[in-house]
């Protein structure tokens, strides 16, 4: 987030980072979703960052819910 902020949020950069970290299993779903909910002024650019990745985070949240439902069956 801070790197993208300092780079003036190049279009799609943060989304590419998130997808890559997710696909490479570097960061787990719970960490992405916790970041989404963590509203703090400590790091600038959170609003723009969320705007870039919100659709992907929504997909991730939906996929995680479906996976949880399948495991419960």
From Swiss-Prot:
Q: Which SUPFAM superfamilies match?
A: ARM repeat
Q: How is it modified after translation?
A: Phosphorylation; hyperphosphorylated during mitosis.
Q: Where is the W2 domain?
A: 1-70
Under the heading InterPro entries, the entry gives: ARM-type_fold (IPR016024), W2_domain (IPR003307)
Q: Keywords on this record?
A: Initiation factor, Phosphoprotein, Protein biosynthesis, Repressor, Translation regulation
Matching Pfam families, A to Z?
W2
The source's domain of life comes to Eukaryota
Q: Does the keyword Kinase apply?
A: no
From the Swiss-Prot or TrEMBL record, what is one GO molecular function term? translation initiation factor activity
One GO biological process from the UniProt record? regulation of translation
Q: Which PROSITE patterns match?
A: W2
Q: What is the documented function of this protein?
A: Appears to play a role in the switch from cap-dependent to IRES-mediated translation during mitosis, apoptosis and viral infection. Cleaved by some caspases and viral proteases.
Q: Which family does it belong to?
A: Belongs to the eukaryotic initiation factor 4G family.
Subunit structure, interactors included: Interacts with the serine/threonine protein kinases MKNK1 and MKNK2. Binds EIF4A and EIF3.
Name of protein: Eukaryotic translation initiation factor 4 gamma 2
Species: Gallus gallus (Chicken)
From which lineage does this chain's organism come? Eukaryota, Metazoa, Chordata, Craniata, Vertebrata
Gene label:
EIF4G2
């Amino acid at each position: 987030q801070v790197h993208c902020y300092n780079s003036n949020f190049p279009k799609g950069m943060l989304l590419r980072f998130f997808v890559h970290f997710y696909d490479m299993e570097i960061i787990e779903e719970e960490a992405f979703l916790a970041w989404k909910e963590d509203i703090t002024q400590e790091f600038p650019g959170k609003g723009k960052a969320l705007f870039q990745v919100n659709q992907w985070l929504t997909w991730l949240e939906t996929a995680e819910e479906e996976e949880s439902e399948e495991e419960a069956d």
